[in-house]
Regions:
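Hydrophobic "anchor" residues on beta-strands that sit immediately upstream
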Residues: 26, 57, 124, 154, ...
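Active-site groove signature of glycoside hydrolases
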Residues: 83-101, 126-131
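N-terminal pre-domain/capping segments
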Residues: 1-81, 243
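Catalytic cores of phosphodiester-bond-cleaving enzymes
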Residues: 105-132, 228, 234-239
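Active-site-adjacent beta->alpha loops and helix N-cap segments on the catalytic face
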Residues: 37-49, 97-111
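Active-site beta-loop-alpha junctions enriched in small/polar residues
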Residues: 7-11, 32-36, 61-65, 93-95, ...
Length: 243
């Protein structure tokens, strides 16, 4: 069953974000975690208590460097257990200045360890593919290393991180995703996330050819303060999937 979510706008009042989701048919929100902190402006601590009491589903999207797996992995697990979550996203990132030929192999080991840790608590782990901006977990070969080492890890495919439809198909051939980040982009731009229809991605081609019969989570990463941009993005994808 397809579930529709969206990345929370952490500069807005949280109750307003929840109400926006309920009015417009979003099933859950994505909340970011970075440097040991759940990201939300003007929210008192502990934030996880407020998210729990709001009684609206969220999924945590953690930005981790290879060092962060050991530094923050246990804290992330603590939060997931408190929220009674059964899924989490880790988006591996690395400053190119701090990366070398061994960095990808370190990521493979870190991912395997944390997937096993979370699995022991009944938590499914998604790892996100990168754009060429990061040069880490970006190529199909990178992803193959990850999933060969840790078959229990699931793929979160960020559509806006592809270089071409061929790149997309090669990733899908490695592992079919069970979760998607959706936004638009121009192929000439290294890293870009736009409302659907503001770039040049052909989502009919993507869903009817490369992701045919997709049945999982769809998270809209539409960086806009304009509600209509988010609503219309969802409507475009629903029309492709359900008409």
């Amino acid at each position: 069953m397809i579930e529709f979510g969206r990345s929370v706008r952490w500069f807005n009042d949280y109750d307003s974000e929840v109400e926006f989701c309920k009015r417009n048919g979003f099933d859950f929100m994505q909340v970011w975690y970075k440097d040991g902190v759940l990201l939300y402006d003007n929210m008192s601590e502990p934030k996880e208590k407020i998210f729990l009491e709001a009684d609206f589903p969220i999924i945590i999207h953690a930005l981790f460097t290879v060092d962060d797996y050991d530094k923050y992995g246990e804290d992330l697990l603590r939060i997931l257990k408190f929220l009674r979550h059964k899924e989490v996203i880790i988006h591996p990132v690395q400053n190119p200045k701090n990366a070398n030929n061994e960095t990808m192999y370190k990521l493979v080991e870190c991912n395997k360890r944390i997937t096993e840790l979370f699995y022991n608590y009944g938590i499914k782990m998604y790892i996100e593919n990168n754009s060429r901006l990061d040069h880490l977990n970006y190529t199909p070969e990178d992803l193959k290393l990850v999933f060969n080492s840790s078959p229990k890890t699931e793929l979160l495919l960020d559509i806006a991180h592809i270089d071409s439809y061929e790149h997309l198909q090669k990733i899908v051939n490695v592992k079919f995703p069970k979760c998607l980040h959706i936004s638009d982009k121009h192929f000439s731009v290294v890293h870009e996330h736009l409302p659907i229809g503001h770039g040049e991605l052909d989502f009919s081609c993507i869903f009817l050819k490369h992701l045919k019969n997709y049945d999982g989570k769809i998270i809209f990463e539409v960086p806009s303060e304009n509600d209509d941009d988010i609503i219309k993005s969802k409507e475009v994808i629903q029309k492709i999937l359900f008409n």
